[in-house]
Amino acid sequence: MWRTKRGRTRRRDAGGNPWQNLEKTSVLQETRMFNETPVNARKCTHILTKILYLLNQGEVLGTREATECFFAMTKLFQSKDVVMRRMVYLGIKELSPIADDVIIVTSSLTKDMTGKEDLYRAPAIRALCSITDSTMLQAVERYMKQCIVDRNAPVSSGALVSSLHLASTAGEVVKRWANEAQEALNSDNIMVQYHGLGLLYHIRKADRLAVTKLVNKLTRQHLRSPYATCFLIRIACKIMEEEDASGNATEDSPLFNFVECCLRNKSEMVVYEAAHAVVNLKRTNPRELSTAVSILQLFCGSSKATLRFAAVRTMNKVAMLHPPAVNVCNLDLEGLIADSNRSVATLAITTLLKTGAESSVERLMKQIATFVAEISDEFKLVVVQAIRSLCTKFPRKHAVTMNFLSGMLREEGGLEYKTSIVDTIILIIEENPDAKEAGLGHLCEFIEDCEHTSLAVRILHLLGKEGPYSKCPSRYIRFIYNRVILENATVRAAAVAAIAQFGACCPDLLPNVLVLLNRCQMDCDDEVRDRATYYYTILNQSNPELNKRFIADHEIVSLPLLEKSLNEHLKGPLAERFDLSIVPKSQVIQPEVNEEVMIMNKAAPKIARVNREEVNTEKLLAIPGIHHVGALHKSCAPVQLTESETEYTVSCIKHCFAHHIVFQFDCVNTLSDQLLENVRVDLELPEGFVSRAVIPCAKLPYGDKESTYVIVQFPEDVPSSIATLGATLRFLVKDCDPATGQPDSDEGYNDEYILEDIEVTVADQMQKSKKQNFLAAWESADTEEWVEAEDTFELSSVTSLQDAVNTILKFLGLAPANLSENVPDGTFRGGVEVLVRSKLAVADGVTMQLTVRSTDMDVAELITSAVG
C-alpha cells in the first residue's frame, strides 16, 4: 500500500498533461462504449471528459462526426449516475452548434428540467436553451417561467441566465417573462437577485422611461445582493451620462445621491464600485471626487492584494484627468512601491509619475529600473504610458526619460511593447526640439539590432524626415546605409527612401548620396532597384523644385481611396488620363490613447483606422455630378437638425470641396404607419451661395436611414462663405400598413418639416495638417508669397487658458500642439496654407493676440474675423 501511494505521488509530482497526446479519431471510436448496456458510468465519464478537452483545445469536429457523437451521447440518459449526467449536459452544449437534429433530446432535457432531482434541473435548463430556437421556445415557455421563480436558487439562476442568452434570438418571447424576472428580483438569494436584475434590465433597456422607473424604485430599497447593487450603480451611471449628453442633468440628482450613499456600504465590492463610478462621472465636482479618492486611499492600505490593486489602478486613471486630487495619496502610493505584488508596485509608481513633482522624477525612475525587468510586457506598457504623459508634463526631464526608454529598448520584449517605446521616443522628438538629437541617436542604435521589420521601416522613415534638419545630418547616413547592406528587402527599400531625403534637403551631401543610390541600383530586389533608380534620376538633375515635389514633400493621397479610384479608372474606356487631383489627401489621424490601462485584449485584432473622408468618399462618388467638384477637402462630424424624439430625425454632414460644399442629410422615419417618398431638403441660401443640384431620396420606409444631398457652390468672396442657412424637409406622405410597410394606395399628400438652421463656419472649411517643426514652418512663411493678419481679442467669456484654447479651436477647426501654446497649421479649402500663432494672457479674463500667416489675404482676414 505504501509503494502504491508513493508511486502515485511520483507520477503526480512529475506533472505533465495526461491528455496532451489525444487523437480525435481514437476518442471518437471510444464513444462506441456509450451504446453498451448496462452503461459503465465511470468509463463513459472519462470519455466525455476527453471529448470536452479536445473541443476546448480548438479541435474541429465535422458535422457528421459531431452528429454521430451527439446521438451516441443521448444513449447515456438511461443511466442515473449524477456526475455522468452533468457531463452529458456539457457535451450537448458544446456539440449543439455543430451537430444536426439536436432537437431530438428536447423531451429528455424537458423531463430533467421539470423533474425532482435538483442536481439535474439547472444544467438541463442550460443545455435545453443551447439547442432551442425561437420556433421551439414557446413549447417550453411555461416551464421556463416556472423555473425562473423556483425556490431552488441554482435552478432559478440557471433559468435567468439562460433567458438572457435566449433574448438575443427570441427577444419578443423573453420580454413576456418580465413579471417572473421581477419576482426573482425579490429573492433572498444574492445570485438570483443579481441575475433577475440583469434579465429585467435587458428586457426594459430599450424603454428609457421604464429603466428610469426601475432604477428609482430599486435605489429606494435595500438590495441584499452586492452584485445586484454594483450592477444597479452601473445602470444609474449610464442614465446620468445620457442625461448629461442630452442636457437634462440636474445638480441634485437622486441617482448620484444613491451612488454616493453606496460609498458607505458594508460590502467592499459595492464601496469600490461606487468610488470607481464617482471618479469616472463627468459631472463629479472636486468635493465629491475627494470623497471617492479618500475611499481608494483606505483601500491602498488593505491587507488584500485585490483591493490594493483595484484602488491603485483606479487612482492611476484619476491621475490622468485630475492629478491634484490624487496628490493627497502620494505618501500611501510611495508605500506601495515596495509592495510584494509587482502589479501593484508598477501602478503605484506610474501614478506617482503623473502626480509627483519634477524633482522626484529621477528618484522614481531609478526605483522602476530596479524591478522593470521582472514584470510582464503588459505591465511594462503601463510604465511606458506613464513616461509618455511625464514627457508632456516635464519636458526638461527628457534626458532622464530618454535614457530610461533606450534601456528598455535593449531588453527582451514583444512587438507591441517595443512599438510603445518607439512611439514615446518619436513623440518626444516631435514635440521637444532639445531632445531631437538624443532621440534620433537612440533610435539609430536600436535599428542596428532590430528584429521587427515594421519598426525598422518606421524608424528609417523618421530618420529621413528629421535627419536632414539635424545639426550633423551626415552622421545618420552611415546608420541608414548599414540597413541597405544587412537587412531584408523591405527594410532596404525604406533605407533607400531615407537616404534620398538627405540628398533632396542637404545639397552638400548630394554627391555622396548619389554614389550610395548608384550602388543600390545593383540590388537583387526589384523594389529596392526601382526606388534607387527613381531617386537617383531626380536628384541627378539638381532641380530643387523636382526634389521638393517628388521626394521631400510628405503629403500623400489616401491610399485606400487611390486604390479604389484606380480600379474604377481601369474599368472605364481609358480614353482620358487618370486625374490624381480627384483623390483626397491622407489626413493626420491622431493615435488612439487607451485610458483604461491594464485592460489589453490581445485576442482582438486591431482594426485599420481610416479617417472620415475615406469613409464618406464611397457614398459621395455615387452622387450624380460629384466628379466635377474636384477632390474632397474635409468631411465634418454629423450635426442633429431635429430632436431625437420627433417623428422624423435628420442629421447633416457637411462635405467641403475647393469651391463647393455638399450637404448630406441622413433621414430616419420613426412613424410605422407612413411611407415617405421624394424626400429632399430645401435650403434658404444667403447671397453668393448657388445651389447646383438637389438629389432626393426616392423612398424612406419606417426605421430605415436614407440620405438626400444638396450641392452648393461657395461665394467668390471668401469672407462671405461663413453663413447660416435655413432648412426645410419636404416629402410625399403615403399611409401604409404598419405590419407590412406597404402603402394603402398610390395617392399621398405633400408635407414639410422645419429643421434647425445649418451653420457654415471656418472650422468646416479648415483641414488640420501636421508640421513636424512649427517654428521652422512659421519662420519660412515670412516671405512675400505669404500675407500676415494680426489682431488682439478680449475673450471675456472665458477665465482660463484651457477654456481659451478650446474656444479658439471651436472657431478655427485646428488642434493644439503638445507642450506649446501654438496651434498647428492647417489647410483651407482649395489648398491655401494657413499658419496660426496665438499668445494668451490671463488677467480678469483672457486676452489673446492672434497672428495668421497664409498664402491668401482673404483667408487670413476670414480667420481673424471668425474669432472676433
From Swiss-Prot:
Topological type in the membrane: Peripheral membrane protein
Segments of this protein annotated with the region Disordered: 1-22
GTP-binding recorded as keyword: no
PANTHER family in the record: COATOMER SUBUNIT GAMMA, COATOMER SUBUNIT GAMMA-2
Protein name: Coatomer subunit gamma
Coiled coil, from the record: none
Any one biological process term the GO annotation gives: organelle transport along microtubule
Keyword Protein transport: yes
Assembly with partners or alone: Oligomeric complex that consists of at least the alpha, beta, beta', gamma, delta, epsilon and zeta subunits.
